[in-house]
Amino acid sequence: MIFIDACFRKETPYTPIWMMRQAGRYLSEYQESRKKAGSFLELCKNSDLATEVTLQPVEILGVDAAILFSDILVVPLEMGLNLEFIPKKGPHFLETITDLKSVESLKIEAYKQLNYVYDTISQTRQKLSKEKALIGFCGSPWTLATYMIEGEGSKSYAKSKKMLYSEPEVLKALLEKLSLELIEYLSLQIQAGVNAVMIFDSWASALEKEAYLKFSWDYLKKISKELKKRYAHIPVILFPKGIGAYLDSIDGEFDVFGVDWGTPLEVAKKILGDKYVLQGNLEPTRLYDKNALEEGVERILKVMGNQGHIFNLGHGMLPDLPRENAKYLVQLVHAKTRR
């Protein structure tokens, strides 16, 4: 698999490419599948439809890897927090974590309740071409904790940060509990058939450097270290969004570092490029215009050269991006990097 070879810095015939949120609303096929499911959460839980959606970008765009269609919040959902997705607003938990008692009341071994995810993986792997990789994923402990404490997405993360500074032992208990779940959850994804795993730390930038390293990065390192110990042949990709200023403190046992669009690739390459393969980091809105897209691709390839790079966006696909430009991006990267 070209994608897996690239994760381990092996020679590849061209630079592989896939896109975060490549299965999404910009594809009419996705919208049809979602309509059949009835809701976003039901789509995640319906393995047949989730498989369909996972495969769509590979078939339509020609990307080098499929990423499991699911949501990071299925873990807290199965730990006992009722979850709903409100149209035009996003996820909302009906209960939140407020103290040590609420942390202790969370169910353990929630990963055993996620068979619908593992079924999607095994179905997808059976239908996916042998040359194409399947990526599994989860959210980081810190990012999941913010949703569980705030109840929804937040601009200030005030409740989470208040807990971090005034009751750090409560937050640590939650992060520890989540870390244990996520290690087993990703392990079961690997056993079900994924070829790589990725951890999304979407709200990494909410924390100052010292707090980030202690309350997020340390837990990411713990998870990735255990996964590499168990499955050395499976690449681990970490994507902490918005921490470009903290790169000099990044270390740990993982293979690929996801670079967001706000971090110049030349900076990431200088600091991390010898240790980790870099993934990223085209600004997604460049896909609105072909000239802007071409300029962005040219700039990235000039910095990254032939090895140590997986092409991706610096954040997820937007719902109204033209699909023909997404397809063109894949063709362009393949053509320009063919060796």
From Swiss-Prot:
Enzyme Commission number(s) from the entry: 4.1.1.37
Site (Transition state stabilizer): D71
UniProt keyword annotations, A-Z: Cytoplasm, Decarboxylase, Lyase, Porphyrin biosynthesis
GO MF term set: uroporphyrinogen decarboxylase activity
First and last residue of the signal peptide: none
A GO CC annotation given for this chain: cytosol
List of residues binding substrate: R21, Q22, A23, G24, R25, D71, Y147, S202, H315
Matching SUPFAM superfamilies: UROD/MetE-like (SSF51726)
Keyword Mitochondrion: no
InterPro entries for the chain: UROD/MetE-like_sf (IPR038071), Uroporphyrinogen_deCO2ase_HemE (IPR006361), Uroporphyrinogen_deCOase (IPR000257)
Reaction catalysed by this enzyme: uroporphyrinogen III + 4 H(+) = coproporphyrinogen III + 4 CO2
Family matches, as CDD domains: URO-D (cd00717)
Pathway: Porphyrin-containing compound metabolism; protoporphyrin-IX biosynthesis; coproporphyrinogen-III from 5-aminolevulinate: step 4/4
Presence of the UniProt keyword Zinc in the record: no
Localization in the cell: Cytoplasm
Enzyme class of the recorded protein, top EC level: lyase
GO BP terms: protoporphyrinogen IX biosynthetic process from glutamate
Protein family according to the UniProt entry: Belongs to the uroporphyrinogen decarboxylase family.
NCBIfam families assigned to the protein according to its UniProt record, in alphabetical order: hemE
Assembly behavior: Homodimer.
Function (record text): Catalyzes the decarboxylation of four acetate groups of uroporphyrinogen-III to yield coproporphyrinogen-III.
Name used for this protein in its record: Uroporphyrinogen decarboxylase
Species annotation: Helicobacter pylori (strain Shi470)
